[in-house]
């Protein structure tokens, strides 16, 4: 059966959310929505009970080529030329669940200040560093405060609402090769894969793995490929040096923190209080 995205009229005529949406996700997810598509701004949605499909007025049915949950978001790709890609953001505001439906265009329109990224120093950013990390990054150039404590995965992380939102495992090129051969990196990446965002940063070049003196040529690159296929959501970044490894880690964690924070913001032109009562 081909998965379908359905837009229908909400049979509750007095509802402030006049549309019903069906997402072909798992057993099927129904939402009430403010509009039938996020054309110019993000659209507020709210969970809905499964309706009697035979009795509702269906506006359109479109085959979905992809409907995938990725952390707090659901990415929807429809099998048509226009109005093809959109995303549902599941978050909360003041303890109440809220859902935003957006396209790349409507997301940019809602937050125009984010269209052109600018280099800036994060003054109040706090990174968590694993207490077992020795000779770690200081991020001194970026005004970052470090909080030492035991991390269940990775060497550095950022926290949102008491939970780790992203983490980075740091490896020198020698430690990376050793952990590949003894299998410990496999377990580390399995733990990282359980987080919303994670990566492994290597202070060295990929080409140096081809010259490893204690293994046959190609053995370690083969292990890298196998791990990357096994854990595709945990990228392995070869940052060339310690300096660039620190720089990449800072930017990755800052972006992860900014992204998670942005997901908690209300729709432009509508307060979150208004959104949570529009159901």
What are these regions (language model features)?
Residues 1-40, 47-137, 145-279:
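Extended, alpha-helix-rich binding/interface surfaces that flank or overlap catalytic cores
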């Amino acid at each position: 059966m081909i998965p379908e995205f359905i837009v229908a009229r909400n049979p509750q005529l007095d509802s402030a959310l006049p549309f019903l949406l069906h997402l072909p996700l798992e057993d099927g997810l129904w939402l009430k929505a403010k509009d039938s598509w996020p054309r110019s701004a993000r659209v507020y949605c709210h969970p809905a009970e499964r309706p009697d499909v035979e009795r509702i007025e269906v506006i359109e049915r479109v085959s979905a080529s992809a409907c995938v949950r990725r952390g707090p978001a659901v990415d929807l790709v429809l099998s048509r030329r226009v109005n093809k890609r959109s995303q549902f953001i599941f978050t909360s505001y003041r303890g109440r669940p809220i859902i935003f439906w957006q396209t790349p265009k409507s997301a940019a329109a809602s937050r125009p200040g984010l269209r052109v990224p600018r280099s800036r120093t994060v003054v109040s950013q706090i990174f968590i560093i694993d207490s077992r990390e020795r000779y770690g990054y200081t991020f001194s150039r970026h005004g970052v405060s470090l909080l030492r404590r035991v991390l269940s995965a990775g060497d550095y992380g950022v926290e949102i609402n008491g939970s780790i939102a992203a983490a980075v495992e740091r490896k020198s090129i020698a430690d990376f090769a050793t952990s590949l051969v003894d299998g410990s990196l496999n377990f580390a990446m399995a733990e990282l894969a359980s987080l919303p965002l994670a990566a492994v940063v290597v202070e060295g070049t990929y080409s140096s793995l081809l010259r490893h003196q204690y293994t046959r040529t190609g053995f370690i690159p083969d292990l890298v490929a196998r791990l990357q296929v096994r854990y595709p959501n945990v990228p392995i970044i070869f940052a060339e040096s310690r300096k660039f490894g620190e720089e990449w880690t800072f930017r990755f964690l800052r972006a992860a923190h900014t992204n998670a924070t942005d997901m908690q913001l209300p729709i432009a032109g509508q307060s979150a209080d208004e959104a949570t009562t529009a159901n």
